[in-house]
Amino acid sequence: MNVPEVNIKQLLEAGVHLGHKTLRWNPKMKKYIFGEKNSIHIIDLTQTVTFFKTALNEIHKCVSRGGKILIVSTKKQASEQVSLLAKETDQFFVNYRWLGGMLTNWNTIQNSIKRMKKLEDQLSKDDIGFTKKEILKQGKEKEKLQRSLGGIADMKKLPQLIFIIDTNIESLAVAEAKKLNIPIVAILDTNSDPTDIHFPIPGNDDARRSINLYCDLLKNTIINASKFIEIKPIDDSKEKSKNKKLNAETVVKKTEEKSI
């Protein structure tokens, strides 16, 4: 499987090893912590390398099978990068606000997406037959929907995998994915809870340099995996049956010719 290299040097340079202050830690992250320095927990990067490779392999496997990934982070430091990553790799994203039921109440969310697209279509026309006040009101509604749903506007069904940066902020996303048994890959800082995360990646979830590195690794993995999307094998049982029938007909025909 072809995934990008992950090594301790690049993680160090991006500040991935820097956790939160020791007072803010989650004891469940203890096994991922190397030690502390100046009252800040230091993440064990040897484990980060191992877990990151495992996660990237899972992402590669998902995409190469034609699966789609939902990339989630509504925090300021990651918002722009998450949007860019998803657009460059043809995946989906949520980077403004996670709406309750975004996964577990998918039918209702789809109706909201339809409403958003209808407003986009209406407001793109020169003469839409509404007053200025109505146009202004609809414009605000459209913008509100676009902020929350623009990244999943073309998502026809639930994603096969979710990638999250900061599970504390995105606790609703974690809970909904867990309920629906959707695998979660997540960056876990020293104040995170790894309990419901299938593929944890211990690392700094606040520094822009760290977030940029995560997104770059994810981007390269997805782009590479897209080249190997599995084509559904042709069911040759019908073809074999057809050939058998043709062979049988040929034999009968030859027999009839001999008897004439």
Residue ranges: model-predicted function:
Residues 1-9, 223-260:
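Intrinsically disordered, compositionally biased charged tails
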Residues 2-233:
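Ribosome large-subunit tunnel/peptidyl-transferase-proximal elements
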